[in-house]
Amino acid sequence: MPILKPISGHGSTGGIRRYLEKGGRALARDLFNLSYDERDAGALGEDAKEACAWDAEMDATRAAFGTDAPWRGKPARTFKHFVLSPDPGDDIDLATLRELACSWALRHFDDHEIAIVYHDDNARGIPHAHIVVNNANLRTGYRMQTQHPEDLNRDLQDMARERGLSGLSNDRAPESPSKARGRAGAGGPRSRRSVYLGRAEKELSLIHISEPTRPEPI
């Protein structure tokens, strides 16, 4: 199953861009809702993509919307950095990973600026994706909201399986009445979420995302 690791970023996105692109380590980039957008690639051309300073554009967007300001006395979470690591057993190629990463990012963050950078700097040379999502919602002007963060990983698992890749099933087979009674006698049935978390911890894919309870004002 693919592993999704979310990391909260604070401050400028310049630091994360330098980290992701230093030394020519980036295999490829995909950009959305910036001065270059992959969906307009034919009209914009490769030169426009190379010229896109996505970190500076994200910083400017947050400044324009005022989403850099502290929230309830805490430093602003200026961006989210998701590391999407495919299952090594899938032997995924870069093109397949790019399609999966872009589809997942746009499904959940279509109203945000997105930069995806791909690496293969691990022991087995397996490509993986670094997905950087700016905190400002371009449609509402509010900071990023993830009302159901568990859906981020659930959707990734479903999308992987739809593409013939390994993925954790989000469906549980029905239990027999006797098995259900036995589980209840042992402390009650475990929820699908608790089952998933137990397995995910073993796979080092536990998601922990802290979100505000309501949209924050500009």
For each feature predicted by the language model, list its residue ranges.
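N-terminal nicking endonuclease/strand-transfer module with a His-rich metal-binding environment
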Residues: M1-L206, S210
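Positively charged, low-complexity/disordered segments
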Residues: E211-R214, I218
